[in-house]
C-alpha cells in the first residue's frame, strides 16, 4: 500500500506540474518576415495580425521588414493602411509595441527608398542587413513570410 500511495502522490504531482511544463514548451520564438508594403494592404496587415496573435498568445515575436514592407513603419502608412478582413495596421503595430516586439528594417531596402533614421526614430526598431535576417531565422523556432 505504501508503494501505491507514493506512486499516487507522484502521479498527482506530475499531473499538477504538467500544464505548466506543456505551456512552457508550447511557447515559441517566431519571426515574421514581411516583404509586402502599402501596395498589398491585406497581406501587409495580415503579417502584423499574425505577429500580434502570436504575441497575444505569449510567444516571443520579431518582425523583419524588407523590400516594399519597409514603408510600413512610416507614420502616415501606419495610420492609414487597413487590410480587407485583416484589420488596421496601426492597431496591430501598437499592440506589438506594447507586447515588446522588436522590428528589424532592411537597411538596403530603406536606403533604396530614401528612408533614413527618421523612419525608426522612437520605434522599437533597428536597421539590419541580410546577414541579420539569416541569423534571426536560425535563432527562431518558426518563420512566417508575407
Regions found by a protein language model. Give the residues of each.
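Bacterial N-terminal signal peptides that target proteins for export
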Residues: 1-11
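Boundary of Sec targeting at the N-terminus
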Residues: 24-25
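Short, glycine-rich nucleotide/cofactor-binding loops
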Residues: 32-45, 77
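Solvent-exposed loop/turn segments at secondary-structure junctions
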Residues: 37-40, 68-72, 103, 109-113
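N-terminal, post-signal-peptide region of Sec/Tat-exported proteins
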Residues: 44-82
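A glycine-rich helix N-cap at a beta->alpha junction
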Residues: 81-107
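C-terminal partner/receptor-binding element of secreted or periplasmic proteins
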Residues: 125-146
Amino acid at each position: 500500500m505504501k508503494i501505491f500511495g507514493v506512486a499516487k502522490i507522484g502521479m498527482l504531482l506530475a499531473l499538477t506540474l504538467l500544464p505548466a511544463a506543456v505551456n512552457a514548451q508550447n511557447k515559441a520564438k517566431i519571426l515574421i518576415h514581411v516583404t509586402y508594403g502599402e501596395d498589398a494592404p491585406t497581406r501587409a496587415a495580415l503579417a502584423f495580425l499574425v505577429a500580434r496573435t502570436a504575441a497575444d498568445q505569449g510567444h516571443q515575436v520579431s518582425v523583419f521588414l524588407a523590400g516594399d514592407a519597409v514603408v510600413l513603419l512610416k507614420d502616415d502608412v501606419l495610420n492609414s493602411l487597413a487590410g480587407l478582413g485583416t484589420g488596421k495596421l496601426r492597431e496591430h503595430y501598437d499592440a506589438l509595441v506594447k507586447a515588446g516586439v522588436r522590428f528589424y528594417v532592411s537597411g538596403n531596402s530603406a536606403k533604396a527608398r530614401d528612408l533614413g533614421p527618421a523612419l525608426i526614430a522612437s520605434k522599437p526598431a533597428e536597421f539590419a542587413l541580410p546577414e541579420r535576417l539569416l541569423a534571426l531565422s536560425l535563432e527562431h523556432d518558426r518563420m512566417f513570410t508575407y
